[in-house]
């Protein structure tokens, strides 16, 4: 029988005696996390922050004698800094450093299980939100990242110098496979680069996945032949099991599709990483939808900020990721949105608190993920979208294409004309933020499709105060 070491003292002691270390200087190899923390009344901020560090690393609620069988100083998380949140009562930013050895190589699943596991139900906290993570380069290098990345995607598609243009097929549910393929063809023939399955299209009684894949691929090939442009459709391979997901991906490869899609949050990071690695091995692009993200990222004081999910998805693997629009129907303040957009596609991003970036992040040359602006956007938004997101983005219109009064193909043409006009105006030195509406009106003179779209949506706005603010 193993005996406890002499000197072991059973009982409960304050977390801060072990896990609050304000004199600690983080190492380059540490994983750093920033939590927005709201302690329960009467709980000191230092104790609450130390509790977060403990419960997300080596600690438990009482002293255990097996602590003596390891080196806690080597493995414990440490709260090294604590800041009051400006303009908020009883809220604090707790900065915690975690040793590299706490995490399995190449596993987003393991990182999140530690950082946002049981600690979020801790009674000493009224609320807790993971605001940001700094992944050390030593850990970054164990991840594959996006299957291909922005540069390789452009080379595959032979499309340069402008944002990519897409459309989500609507109605999202209820179409037969043949009618679905017809809508895909009309949109691609009208001028779009991509069309897309909506997130909840999988394999339902009204349209089984195999039928959809075949009719969609026929539409892609027909549109490519008629336009002499590379086209694609995001075939959603998300399924109830990983085995079924991979079966659908293999079939998509067999019929020649260039890109597939996964709902990463509902499907899970393990499934997503598996699919991303397969996509790189098989030369298939991977579009990622973020369905369910707002359940955990929309509340300001509890959950996980989307910038964390975006970083994790880039490591797990995805060539596209939905990122909000700033100007459409979905949540997203400009500074915050562009902060995590840069974290998706840039190789090195400096700390910038004004944009919600709490740590400098070096991705060590990992390929970037292209942001997808989608949700309640139409032709009048085009100048702002081009000005905000730049060329390395995908502008994804659903109702803003299929809602055109003349049909799907004219709707696609209207969007393509608006995009080309805005890119040309920008390249000529015009300021889209000031002159965007004039650019669109000028283009309407020679595009009746665009003129009809502008007339239809001239009064449509989504003006609600953003909740995602600093």
Curated annotation (Swiss-Prot):
Localization annotation: Carboxysome
GO cellular component: carboxysome
Residues bound to substrate: 118, 168, 172, 290, 322, 374
InterPro entries listed in its UniProt record: RuBisCO, RuBisCo_large_chain_AS, RuBisCO_lsu_C, RuBisCO_lsu_C_sf, RuBisCO_lsu_fd_N, RuBisCO_lsu_N_sf, RuBisCO_lsuI
Co-factor requirement: Mg(2+)
Feature type site, description Transition state stabilizer: 329
GO terms, biological process: photorespiration; reductive pentose-phosphate cycle
CDD domains, per the entry: RuBisCO_large_I (cd08212)
Active site: 170, 289
Record's catalysed reaction(s): 2 (2R)-3-phosphoglycerate + 2 H(+) = D-ribulose 1,5-bisphosphate + CO2 + H2O; D-ribulose 1,5-bisphosphate + O2 = 2-phosphoglycolate + (2R)-3-phosphoglycerate + 2 H(+)
Post-translational note: The disulfide bond which can form in the large chain dimeric partners within the hexadecamer appears to be associated with oxidative stress and protein turnover.
Extra remark: The basic functional RuBisCO is composed of a large chain homodimer in a 'head-to-tail' conformation. In form I RuBisCO this homodimer is arranged in a barrel-like tetramer with the small subunits forming a tetrameric 'cap' on each end of the 'barrel'.
Subunit structure as annotated in this protein's UniProt entry: Heterohexadecamer of 8 large chains and 8 small chains; disulfide-linked. The disulfide link is formed within the large subunit homodimers. RuBisCO interacts with the C-terminus of CcmM, and can be found in complexes that also include carbonic anhydrase (ccaA). RuBisCO associates with both the internal and shell portion of carboxysomes.
Name of this chain's protein: Ribulose bisphosphate carboxylase large chain
Organism: Synechocystis sp. (strain ATCC 27184 / PCC 6803 / Kazusa)
Gene: cbbL
